[in-house]
Amino acid sequence: MNGKLYHGACFYPELWDEDVLDEDIRMMERIGINVVRIGEFAWSRMEPEKGRIDVGFFADVIRKLRDNKIETVMCTPTATPPIWLTHGHPERMHVNEKGETMGHGSRQHACTNHPYFRERARLIIKHIAKEIGELPGLIGWQLDNEFKCHVAECICETCRTLWHKWLEDRYQTIDRLNEAWGTGVWSETYQCFEQVPQPGPTPFLHNSSLRTMYQLFSMDKISEFAREQAEVIRAYSDAPITHNSSVMFGVDHEDLFKSLDFASFDTYASQENSQAFLFNCDLWRNIKKGRPFWIMETSPSYSASLESYAAPHQNGYLKAEAVSSYALGGAAFCYWLWRQQRAGSEQPHGSVLSAWGEPDVGYENVLEAERARREVEHIMLATAPLQAETAVVYSDRAKVFLKTEPHRGLHYRTLITEFYDRLLKMGIHRDVILEGSPLDGYKLLFTPFIHYLPPAFIKKAEAFAQSGGIWIAGPLTGGRTEHHTIHTDCGLGPLEKCSGVKTLFTFPMDERNSSGTAFGVKAPLSLWSAVFEAGGTKAVGMIEKGPASGKAFITEHKCGKGKIVMLGSMPAGEAGDIMMKKLISHYAEEAGVEQKTDVTPGTVVAPRKGADGLVWVVINMDGKGGAVTLDGNGTDLLSGRPVTGRVTLGPHDYRVILLSENK
């Protein structure tokens, strides 16, 4: 998988006759598509009847693709179990939180924990891996397809049994569970693990501990399913393994990718939401650090299903997406899908070719993206992304806690993307990292919206501050235990103890007309907030209006050579945005953050390092054009011309600049 940038598409040869297949492959080669993904929905083609397995068709397709200089990522087809596995067997099906049993006719309809499903999954994967695993054209494997895309936690009888076993392994005794969960509330106390319900229908809300733990249980079982598939494949193939995921789905990415070889994700962000696209790149670059990520699916024009559709991309945006993904650490930029499907629930979806074989509306943009790939490939292969000095922690566990306790519709993905977007617009080069990621090389660390911070993370972040880093914790951070209960020793538990503050109380500030002042700016305060008595720490932000007037909402605590800054509330509105930018600028300067560029909003700078020095890849994402100011002189590597000062870009344009070491 080394030595090139990939430009690919998801391909469904099993849906078309041989003439169409041959023409598709010829056209792919002609326009520069050099990799395809196949097989993820083809279980019934591979095993039309129980035990009658034949994957020869796909082996032949891989050979034919290779003959045309196109490489293949092969998938396991477990997202779409065939009718013979599900018909007449409701016990094998996914059951949602309403207690509704899923039927055949879509995808992800079976329970992935059912032992018979697991048995048949292992068997079909073994056959695929044995026949295809050593083919020269095979360069990678994708497990399943978008775990938990359409379904959340399953509450079938199989999962009930596994849930009880999971709880017993975690808590050892039922008394420990009762104590940890506080089941004395509403007389929920259990006498044995078998009595603990799943989060099915109830008159009101479930216990927070039960709801959160069930989601974590579900995530653990999906990771187990992935490990099981990977073990089968590795017995017959050395090709690297991935899974195409998304931060939208109910999986623990840190755990899931421990057993996989490279990270890949699917994204359908619009130009108006390009910050979500860039957030993904900055996150997935760090999920398997040091290894390029893949965009396994994105639309060449627009996404659609029978029930909805998105607006087509503006001309030029696809090129900007492709270049930014390569510049930010990606090795592949792939479309869903090559040829429009003539049937099924996604038949309206945008594609490279229409169902009748003509170029679709995004076709010219695909050609433009390919020209860009060819133009920047040699530079990307000779350089690598520069680690940021600023890090934002992403946590799937935090996502779970906010799903259990969303207050008034809070959504973790929205909150964390908005927080990230502020750094992006300020021109600060940033990494989005996982809870378990090392903090070496960072100077400024943000941990927003993480209700529960594990002791190991707090110890690591405190050591980071001791050695000179600045850790900004909050808002909505540290206020819950690992069991999703409230601390009883102090408001923010271990975080409070290392930050030098005393939490007086926590309450929602959104509708209490609360406001505060910090860094010379007065702004409304929002979200469920923590109010501090500064004590021996420095009060940086004070509440001036509302029930907690006169108390602190931002504090600063000296910690070794660095600092721990507590952000107890979220400044809101236009004034809040100004306050947050001042806070970030202040602590970035104090931490010695140098990776900051003077770039217009809507344009991104991706710094890379190579043998010749520092390279900036500058891309306009918003289609309005933009500019970046160089600190000194540079060379435009695409034109060979010297550049200095203010460098402008047209709509969706990109520049690749080698910075001079002599300013």
UniProtKB/Swiss-Prot annotation:
Zn(2+) binds at residues 111, 154, 156, 159. Keywords: Glycosidase, Hydrolase, Metal-binding, Zinc. The keyword Zinc applies. It comes from Bacillus licheniformis (strain ATCC 14580 / DSM 13 / JCM 2505 / CCUG 7422 / NBRC 12200 / NCIMB 9375 / NCTC 10341 / NRRL NRS-1264 / Gibson 46). May play a role in the degradation of rhamnogalacturonan derived from plant cell walls. This is Beta-galactosidase YesZ. It is an enzyme of class 3 (hydrolase). PANTHER family: BETA-GALACTOSIDASE GANA, BETA-GALACTOSIDASE YESZ. Homotrimer. One of its GO terms (biological process) is galactose metabolic process. The keyword Metal-binding applies. GO terms for cellular component: beta-galactosidase complex. GO terms for molecular function: beta-galactosidase activity; metal ion binding. InterPro entries: Beta_galactosidase_C (IPR013739), Beta_galactosidase_Trimer (IPR013738), Class_I_gatase-like (IPR029062), Glyco_hydro_42 (IPR003476), Glyco_hydro_42_N (IPR013529), Glyco_hydro_b (IPR013780), Glycoside_hydrolase_SF (IPR017853). The active site is at residues 146, 297. Substrate binds at residues 107, 145, 346-349. It catalyses: Hydrolysis of terminal non-reducing beta-D-galactose residues in beta-D-galactosides. It comes from the Bacteria. Its EC number is 3.2.1.23. Belongs to the glycosyl hydrolase 42 family.
